[in-house]
Amino acid sequence: MMTHWPSPAKLNLFLYITGQRADGYHTLQTLFQFLDYGDTLHIEPRRDGEIHLLTPVTGVENEDNLIVRAARLLMKVASESGRLPAGSGADISIEKRLPMGGGLGGGSSNAATVLVALNHLWQCGLSIDELATLGLTLGADVPVFVRGHAAFAEGVGEILTPVNPPEKWYLVAHPGVSIPTPVIFKDPQLPRNTPKRSIDTLLKCEFSNDCEVIARKRFREVDAALSWLLEYAPSRLTGTGACVFAEFDTESCARQVLEQAPEWLNAFVAKGVNLSPLHRELL
C-alpha cells in the first residue's frame, strides 16, 4: 500500500487579469505547469473514523488546515453517498518544502493530494470530476492538482483546458517574504483589463504576469530577486508571489546560476512537468 504521496509545486507560466466580477473575484487567463519538486504527505489509514494531522503548521489551527478540511470533506461526501467504508480515517503527516504565500500552490496541492490519496486508500470510488468539484470548494487552484495535467485556466481559474507546454528547467527563488493573495488583488493599481486571447495566441506570445508589477512595488525583496534573476535568463513572478523563477533549457545551465545565488535567497532547481508527480505515481 502506498503511504508516501507527492504534493508537487506549480508555476504560473503566465498570468493575465482580464476583469473583475461583481462579487469581487477576478477573472484571469493563466498557464499552470507542475514541478518535479514539492511536499510529501505520509498517509496511514485508520479504522476508527478519525482524522489526525500529526505535523501541525505554525500559525494554522489543525481544523483550518486545508489538509484536514480536504479529508473531512471527502469523508462527508463519500459517507452521504454511501461510498465510505465503515471506520475510514487517517493519520496524516507532511514533509514541508514549499513556502506559504509563495505562489507555488503548496496548500492547494496538499488538499488535492489528500483528496486523491484518501479516495484511493479508502476505496471510495469518486471520479476525478467529482474530486475536482470538491476541490474547487476548497480553493480555485485545487482542481488543477486533482486533475494532474498542465492546463490553461480561465474564469476565476476553474475552467481548465489540458495543454502541453515545453518542459523546461527552472530556477525557483523565494525572497524570504510571504505575500497573501488579497494584498495583490486589492491593490488599486493592479491591471484588470488585459484583453482575453486564445490559447494558441497566448502560447506564441512572450509570457508575463500582471501581478508582478504590484509585487515588485510593494515588496522590495521580490524586486531584488527578480532583478538578480533577470541578469541570467527570462524570469517572472509565479501566481501572486512571492516566488520568482527563471527558465533554462538544461539542468546544468540552471544549476550554474543557482551556484551564484546570493545568501539571502532561498532557491532550488526543478523541472517543469506536464503530468503531475502525484498522478505519475498512480499509473
UniProtKB/Swiss-Prot annotation:
Its EC number is 2.7.1.148. Pathway: Isoprenoid biosynthesis; isopentenyl diphosphate biosynthesis via DXP pathway; isopentenyl diphosphate from 1-deoxy-D-xylulose 5-phosphate: step 3/6. It holds the Pfam family GHMP_kinases_C. GO terms for biological process: isopentenyl diphosphate biosynthetic process, methylerythritol 4-phosphate pathway; terpenoid biosynthetic process. ATP binds at P99, M100, G101, G102, G103, L104, G105, G106, G107, S108, S109. GO terms for molecular function: 4-(cytidine 5'-diphospho)-2-C-methyl-D-erythritol kinase activity; ATP binding. The keyword Kinase applies. It catalyses: 4-CDP-2-C-methyl-D-erythritol + ATP = 4-CDP-2-C-methyl-D-erythritol 2-phosphate + ADP + H(+). Keywords: ATP-binding, Isoprene biosynthesis, Kinase, Nucleotide-binding, Transferase. It is an enzyme of class 2 (transferase). The active site is at K10, D141. Transmembrane segments: none annotated. Belongs to the GHMP kinase family. IspE subfamily. Homodimer. Catalyzes the phosphorylation of the position 2 hydroxy group of 4-diphosphocytidyl-2C-methyl-D-erythritol. This is 4-diphosphocytidyl-2-C-methyl-D-erythritol kinase. It comes from Salmonella enteritidis PT4 (strain P125109). The lineage of its organism: Bacteria, Pseudomonadati, Pseudomonadota, Gammaproteobacteria, Enterobacterales.
